[in-house]
Amino acid sequence: MFKKLFGKGKEVQKDIAIYAPLTGEYVKIEDIPDPVFAQKMMGEGFGINPTEGEVVSPIAGRVDNVFPTKHAIGLKADNGLELLVHIGLDTVQLDGEGFEVLVSSGDEVNVGDPLVRFNLEFINNNAKSVISPIIITNTDQAASINIYDENAVIKGETKVIDVTMN
């Protein structure tokens, strides 16, 4: 009843597709060279070894968090799914150098909307790895997660995960 009164009758879709936010090579989460991600301590997901320096939104939703160091963005879908797009590994230490954020916290985004541009060569030379984890940070709230084992992925086009939220 409250949802009808306050939610303006809008039915929230529990199913959501997560698309590749970067163009490059798909990497299984277990193969990400960082135990925090590989052991799924932050949640289920996958990685991409990018071939170009632009991140687009992998879901429709809103920007929940832009990290001050510009290396990561948190997104939230209407159904509650929370997603972290983390550009490279140990890139927090670059303190924003090599990154240009194109969105702000609270912005509405659609699949394929540009979020961040980054200097791929700079990250390659100055970070542990350019492999970029994409993590469902509230995995525990998902009823089901189906990950497609892709090879090459194209930003905003290749569907990588189907999620049904509780």
Curated annotation (Swiss-Prot):
Key words, A-Z: Cytoplasm, Kinase, Metal-binding, Phosphoprotein, Phosphotransferase system, Sugar transport, Transferase, Transport, Zinc
Active site per database record: H86
InterPro entries in UniProt: Dup_hybrid_motif, PTS_EIIA_1_perm, PTS_EIIA_component
Segments traversing the membrane: none
Record localization: Cytoplasm
Co-factor remark: Binds 1 zinc ion per glycerol kinase EIIA-Glc dimer. The zinc ion is important for dimerization.
Domain PTS EIIA type-1 as annotated: residue spans: 34-138
Pfam families, per database record: PTS_EIIA_1 (PF00358)
Co-factor(s): Zn(2+)
Matching PROSITE patterns: PTS_EIIA_TYPE_1, PTS_EIIA_TYPE_1_HIS
Site (Important for phospho-donor activity): H71
Gene Ontology BP, a term: phosphoenolpyruvate-dependent sugar phosphotransferase system
Cellular component aspect of the GO annotation: cytoplasm
Gene3D superfamilies reported for this sequence: Glucose Permease (Domain IIA)
Record: residues binding Zn(2+): H71, H86
GO MF entries: kinase activity; metal ion binding
Record keyword Coiled coil present: no
Entry-annotated residues carrying Phosphohistidine: H86
Protein task: The phosphoenolpyruvate-dependent sugar phosphotransferase system (sugar PTS), a major carbohydrate active transport system, catalyzes the phosphorylation of incoming sugar substrates concomitantly with their translocation across the cell membrane. The enzyme II complex composed of PtsG and Crr is involved in glucose transport.
Entry-linked PANTHER family: PTS SYSTEM GLUCOSE-SPECIFIC EIIA COMPONENT (PTHR45008:SF1)
Domain comment (free text): The EIIA domain is phosphorylated by phospho-HPr on a histidyl residue. Then, it transfers the phosphoryl group to the EIIB domain.
Self-association state and partner proteins as the record states: Heterodimer with glycerol kinase (glpk).
Protein name per its UniProtKB record: PTS system glucose-specific EIIA component
Annotated source species: Staphylococcus aureus (strain Mu50 / ATCC 700699)
